[in-house]
Each structure stands twice: as structure tokens, then as C-alpha cells.
Design a protein with these regions (language model features):
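Binuclear metal-dependent phosphoesterase catalytic core
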Residues: 68-130
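His/Asp/Glu-rich metal-coordinating catalytic cores
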Residues: 1-68
Length: 130
């Protein structure tokens, strides 16, 4: 019962929701879909929701045609995550604009497909987690 949202009264100000946890319908980098987690309908009354927990960056719909943003992780945390699309986000309240900002990872977890030594010698190895 700890995930019971408050009643949000609509006023003249923007209601910005902050949430940490998995949300039903979102995915991890390895393709796992959250089926029975926090329901997006509980964000009713929010003009935008900024979320954290799932390491995969995602944008999803909330009630009243509004958007929510799962920021993802600042850098790749393990081999199961993609190398790209990690960083932070900036929300412009006045323009209702959200931008993802990528950060470089100085020590990435690289995952390659190499069939033989020839792949390395001819440059045919494939980076799988970009």
C-alpha cells in the first residue's frame, strides 16, 4: 500500500510528478517487460512525470495526453545494458520540453560477436550492445 498516489488538485501551476520504481509497460535493455508494476493511471493530475529506476531511457504516455520520462542510468552499468543512450535529462517548465543529454562512458562494457580470428584481422567483428 506504499504506492498509493495522492489526490492532485489542478491549479494554475504545473504539477510535476517525481517517481522512483518500475512502471507497467516499460522495458529493460534486455527486453524484459514490466507487466504488474506501478500503473500509469496513478499519475492522473500530473502535467509531466520524471521517473528513475529502470536503466533504459524511455518516454511514455500518462493520463490526459501528457508525457512521462524514465531517465535511465547516467552510464552503462553492465553488459546487459546498451552502451549508448545514457546520461541525464533537462525539463524546461515554461516550454514543456524535455531533452535527454548523453554522457560519454570512459569505461564501457563492450560485447562483441567474433566468429573466428579472421573476423578480428579483417575488421568484421560486430559490436552487439551499441
Amino acid at each position: 500500500d506504499h504506492n498509493i498516489p495522492p489526490d492532485i488538485e489542478k491549479g494554475s501551476n504545473k504539477n510535476i510528478g517525481l517517481f522512483h520504481g518500475p512502471v507497467t509497460g516499460l522495458y529493460t535493455d534486455i527486453g524484459y517487460k514490466f507487466e504488474d508494476e506501478f500503473d500509469v493511471d496513478k499519475f492522473n493530475g500530473c502535467d509531466v512525470v520524471l521517473c528513475g529506476d529502470i536503466h533504459k531511457r524511455q518516454v511514455f504516455d500518462i493520463p490526459d495526453g501528457k508525457k512521462a520520462y524514465m531517465i535511465g542510468s547516467t552510464i552503462q552499468q553492465n553488459f546487459g545494458e546498451t552502451l549508448s543512450k545514457h546520461g541525464y535529462g533537462v525539463y524546461n517548465v515554461e516550454e514543456d520540453q524535455y531533452d535527454f543529454i548523453d554522457l560519454p562512458n570512459p569505461k564501457p562494457f563492450l560485447k562483441f560477436e567474433i566468429s573466428s580470428i579472421d573476423d578480428l584481422e579483417t575488421g568484421k567483428e560486430k559490436l552487439l550492445n551499441y
